[in-house]
Regions:
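A short, basic N-terminal segment
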Residues: 1-41, 135, 330
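Walker A/P-loop nucleotide-binding motif
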Residues: 39-59
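Conserved catalytic segments around the Walker B and adjacent sensor/switch elements
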Residues: 42-44, 66-79, 179
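Mid-core helix/loop region of P-loop NTP-binding domains shared across ATPases and GTPases
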Residues: 57, 80-164, 170-172, 180-188, ...
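Short, hydrophobic-biased segments on the C-terminal half of alpha helices
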Residues: 61, 139, 307-311
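C-terminal helical "lid" subdomain and adjoining coupling/linker elements of P-loop NTPases
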Residues: 201-202, 208-270, 301-305, 322-326
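Short capping segments at the starts of secondary-structure elements
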Residues: 281-288
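Terminal-proximal interaction/regulatory segments of ATP-powered molecular machines
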Residues: 291-334
Length: 334
């Protein structure tokens, strides 16, 4: 049934994108000055999970590489690489400058100096989940490197800027905004149809099943593609020649569980502690949660940072933030 499993992987970037032409155009316009030897703008990409932010950013960078020979690019997930060292190491690794870098002995300033000194070509860097950086001041320093051109991706603009000091805010506020909204049902069906055409045998998946998958995904392309993947595996395991309603029904909860587990696995140690405390409590107020968290870890983060962590887990459907301000509580999403 599946002829090209690559189209069902989360990091797959299609040759042609669906329903995001305005966003592609805005990102392309921000990078356009590089084609004439001028510095790019610093685009700020916002939107909910599964809205195509990462895919479109990587797609736009790939199209830039086709037009500009002398350019370096890389992608960094700041949820995984959330420390200053890991981000700088990832950037240096992309340009082959990490052979003699050691986590314990190499001075942190040395990493940034190497990036500054290597100015032989424009360096376009996609910083995904940038609101997860332990040290947001790093953005100020990176934006000050003349040949380095970041694309910053986060979920909510207000939450992102709330975590920055005035100096960093001032440097970033001039950047063009690229706002992504959730996909509509027909848009998700179109995305799935494109994946099916590229990666499945003809006649194995009909539109009715794709509509059921898109409806269950509720605007989230990650969920839709994961359900399609799980349903196809169910069908292949059963020796079926085509996707059925039963395959889709079985795949929906399995796909959601897989996405949730993947997100839980990506949590930092402090986030994981918070998640476990919320899970153990059933439902808990922010003040009590912070007290338990501060007792559970050796070096607790600030209350503001903890609020940022909880907001991120809410955005990724791990916890449910109920109520407002003093009446707010948190509970784990079933």
């Amino acid at each position: 049934m599946i002829t090209n499993a690559r189209v069902l992987q989360e990091d797959f970037v299609p040759r042609d994108v669906e329903h995001r032409n305005p966003e592609v155009n805005r990102l392309s316009a921000a990078l356009e000055p590089l084609l004439s030897g001028e510095p790019a703008e610093t685009p700020l990409v916002f939107g909910p999970t599964g809205a195509g932010k990462t895919c479109i950013a990587r797609y736009t960078v790939e199209r830039l590489r086709e037009r500009l020979l002398d350019v370096r690019t890389t992608y960094v997930n700041c949820w995984t690489d959330h420390t200053r060292f890991r981000v700088l190491y990832a950037l240096l690794d992309a340009v082959g400058q990490t052979v003699d870098v050691h986590r314990q002995s190499t001075p942190r300033d040395e990493l940034l100096r190497r990036i500054r000194d290597r100015d032989d070509a424009p360096f376009v860097v996609v910083l995904d989940e940038v609101d997860q950086l332990d040290d947001p001041d790093l953005l100020y320093e990176l934006c000050g490197v003349p040949h380095l051109h970041p694309i910053l991706i986060a979920n909510h603009e207000a939450d992102f800027f709330a975590g920055l000091d005035e100096r960093v805010q001032s440097r970033l506020r001039a950047g063009p905004r690229v706002q992504f909204d959730r996909y509509g049902l027909d848009e998700l069906v179109g995305i799935l149809e494109s994946r099916v055409e590229t990666g499945f045998e003809p006649g194995t998946v009909d539109r009715k099943r794709l509509e059921a998958i898109a409806d269950a995904a509720a605007g989230d392309a990650r969920v839709a593609i994961r359900v399609l993947r799980a349903a196809a595996r169910e069908a292949e395991a059963a020796g079926a020649e085509a996707l059925s309603d039963d395959h889709v029904r079985t795949a929906i909860p399995a796909a959601r569980d897989a996405i949730k587990q993947r997100t839980v696995d990506a949590l930092t140690p402090h986030q994981e502690t918070l998640f476990e405390l919320v899970d153990a409590a059933g439902e808990i107020a922010p003040g009590e949660l912070y007290e338990r968290y501060a007792e559970a870890v050796a070096e607790p983060k600030s209350r503001r940072t903890v609020r940022k962590y909880l907001s991120k887990m809410d955005q990724y459907n791990l916890v449910d933030a109920r109520g407002e301000k003093r009446a707010r509580t948190y509970a784990v999403v079933d």
